[in-house]
Amino acid sequence: MKDVEAWTTLVSPSSSRDPRKLAERAQRLESDGWDGASLVDSQCLMGDAFAVLTLAAVSTSTLKLGTGTSNPVTRHPSVLANLAATVQVISGGRMSLGIGRGDSALAHIGARPATVATFDKVLSMLKSYLRNDGVPMSDSASMLAVGRPGLDGIAIANAPETSRLHWLPADLPPVEIEVAASGPKVIAAAARHADWISFSLGADEHRLQWAIDVAREEMDRAGREPGSVRFGAYLPLYPHVDVEFARELSRGIVTSHSRFAVMSNSITGPVSESQRTNLERVKSTYDMTKHGDAAGAHSKVLDDDYIDQFALVGDPDRCVERIERLVDIGIERFNFWTADLDGKAGESYGLAVESILPRVPNRGRSPATPSLD
């Protein structure tokens, strides 16, 4: 069995998004024993993700790093691959490119998520760029938003035959591609191209099992080996002795990730009637100006039972039991959203580090001694 990884985020909903603070947080996360940390890549809500990840890379030595998540629209695939590869080199091979169809990064510039067809094409191109295989010039040019495809009429006697990252060193593995997915079409695209598929379906093992089955069926159809794609999950993790407080901490993230299941105005995957009711409420009330914010009115529409199913909240032992069940069905990377490090929310973060992180099954490292700062 391959090692299970426990990641968290370089920002929590209430923490500072000042890039100068995030390198310090990366150091803290590394000392607390996390395997990796991801960063939101949304240009209107955060500083540049790759600049911050570079800063985090030179400030740490073992912490894996990734975007959570990039999108196929705001950067050309060659630019996105180049940025990820640069962090890969600087970090000594610790970079993972997390990507989805696009959400807040596009909504805040007045655009919708990329189509699944575009996303599929971009995944194929990213894979080629990151492995230093040539991308056909026609494919590369087709992704230019305002450029002028073709080289006719300009002074070039001998043009490159393909588009590639010529500078990539040969001594490092390619950047892993991790797709954030919730619906069957995106899961299938990821199964054809990605190294990891991380599901935004919460901690409901029945919905996650459905998603894994969709991925495995497409992998088989595409002729990919069973172990060539690994599975992860984006999960809110908010342990606390006061379960009501834990639910309140989780509401913003639970709501924003629940929305992914209804982004196209239809519910993806198997759901109970109660889950359907809550998802319909999210669909009709979501306020993008309060994205991920527990103070947003949209976060108040969720029932406690729904939050308890979607998130890992309350008793740490119960959280660990659920994590163990998810490992049993094939989840090997946990992308945990956790609370801020300080204040009362810090009590939840401390429990996550002290009472849950060391008990995540099959991790390939000894837990670190949590920081008491």
Q: What is the meaning of each model-derived region?
A:
Residues 4-20, 70-77, 171-182, 237-240, ...:
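Active-site mouth loops of central-metabolism enzymes
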Residues 1-67, 175, 367-373:
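N-terminal beta1-alpha1-beta2 module of alpha/beta enzyme domains
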